[in-house]
Every structure is written in C-alpha cells, then in structure tokens.
C-alpha cells in the first residue's frame, strides 16, 4: 500500500509540473503493485479447489502429559498447476492446550506436487481441542503483494486424562465374595454381568433376584464368566486440580480392573451415564476413557450430592446387583453417607475419600463408611495415585 501511494504521489507531482521523468518514476511502483497483485491473485491458495489438505494425528486420542505427532500434507488436486505450491508459506494453528502458548515449530519437506509439515504437540489438559485450519501465505515475486488464506478444516484432538498402571490384587477381587462385611450379604462370584433375556436362553441362567427387582427377565452373561463385575463411582468435585486428580484416579482404577478381566463400569454422575445400556455390554478401554473427556465438575455440594445419589440408584443396572463398588468420593452429607451405607448391604465397597487428615467432614465420612463395612482410605488431592491405591488394597497386589 505504501509503495502504491508513493507511486501515485510521484506520478501526480510529475503531471502537475509537466515532468515526464517524474511521471515515469511514479508509474513504475504502481505497475509493480498491480503486477504483484495479479500474480498472487492467479494462484490465490484460498481460491478454487487447486489445493487439498490431509492432517493425521498419532496417537489420537492422547493422554495428558503425552506427545502426539501431527503430519499435514498440502498437495495439488488433479490438474492443478505446480505454481500453486511455489513459495507457499504454511503456518499451523493449535489450541493453547496443545501448543502450550508457543508457536508450533514444524519440519517442512517440499516435493514437486506436495508440501509436508510434521510437528509435535504436547497435551496439557483433558478435553477436546482444536487443530487447524492451516494458514497459507503467498508473496509475489517482487515482494510487494501478499495474500493470506486458510486451508482445510478445523479438526479436534481428544485428550484423555493422565492414568497410571495400577496392580490388581487378584486374591481380593476374586475371593472377595467369600468375605463377609458388616451387615452385608455377598453374592456369589458367578453373578457376573447381566443382560436382557433373549428367546432361547437357558432358564437356568435367569438371575431371579435381579429379575424380580426390575420386573423383567435378565440372565447371567457368558462374557468373562466367573469374574466379578466392578463399578467405579466418581463423585466429581468443583473444576480445578482436585477434579483432574479424581478423574485420573477413577480412570486408572477402571482400566486396571478392566485389564484384569473384570466387567467394569464407570459412573460419573452425568447425563451420559446409561447403566441400563452398560449392563448389556461392558465398555472397553476406549469407552471408559471417553466417558471422562467432557467432565466439567459439579458447581456446588448440592449438585454433587444429587449426582452421586443418581449413580447409586443406577448401581443395580450397572452390575446386576452384585460386584465390587470402588468409589472416589468427596466429603459427604447425611444423605450421601446414608445412601453409601446402603450400598454395602448388598455388595462389598472400597472408597477413596478426598480430603486431608485435618478435614473433619472427610474424616467423618471415612469413619461412617468404615462402620457400614466399606474398606476406606483418605487421601489429599495430588497424592501419588499408586501409593493411594496401594493403601486401599492393603499392598496385596
């Protein structure tokens, strides 16, 4: 723009004074600008279908704290001129949760009909984060005109919570039905995950107590027969570090029991929980982790309590009225404590209560759960996950 204004000013001066030389000098910058604009306009990267993009992310999803490798290819569409790739400058865009707020540094490889970018992203926060679109810039051969456009679509990278490998105490999870808890009756180990009755099912496989409770026939599933179902309850705190710690702990526990062969369900107290559907087919590793991606925490104690009570009401649908319950809890009020005490009347329960040793509400919650027959440890948010799990299992892993 400055060069164009300068040329017009010099040309106007030459015209005013009748100077052919000044007019010629003023015309040259204007011609350069016009030619440059025509040059970049002909091969404008944002116009038409001359360029195609393809972006791959490995791995996707990625865990918090891990690095993903991103590759972007900008290639010529069929019949497009190679001039579209000449002197093309590329810049990728990424959410701050993937870039850390720093410019992305990519390795660029140029070929006759394609340009490839490769760069790493560091997942710093759980969620779904934007990647792209690509920003492409072209400058004319004279360096006087520049065009900028976006290319390709915005894509989403899913970030799972950070998890740790936890050992599963087989002698506890499998032999637990033989252990009596205070005031509890423990179901047999063959009361594994249940599913709806289908025509042709052997009536000897009907689980009559659960059928009576639900008003419909359900049968014991053959899947992982003899392996005790495990349900992980997550009591979400308010957004913050405590929430991320609780989610990582609950996800790690769920993955550990699932990996040990136990039908495992993760109840998070959100509208996405569907215990009725969950009992038809135990979720796999990816489904367990996907259930944690969009969790945002509870706004207050009342909302957290209501969500936990809803989870407890859905327990029978999740595990068929049997199985081990592992709860990641915050300090509970009277209603929450009473509901959790009722859980231990029909199934064994383990609980990790969130709170420091001098947190009176957390200590009172842990004490009442122990009286009701729960196995309980109290841990402060941020504590080492493996050490916390080790304390809960008594080191029998």
Feature roles, as predicted:
Residues 2-5, 133, 165, 368, ...:
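Acidic/proline-rich low-complexity IDRs
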Residues 162, 199, 203-397:
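Exposed, interaction-prone extracellular/peripheral surfaces
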Residues 1-54:
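Extracellular/lumenal glycan-associated context and N-glycosylation machinery
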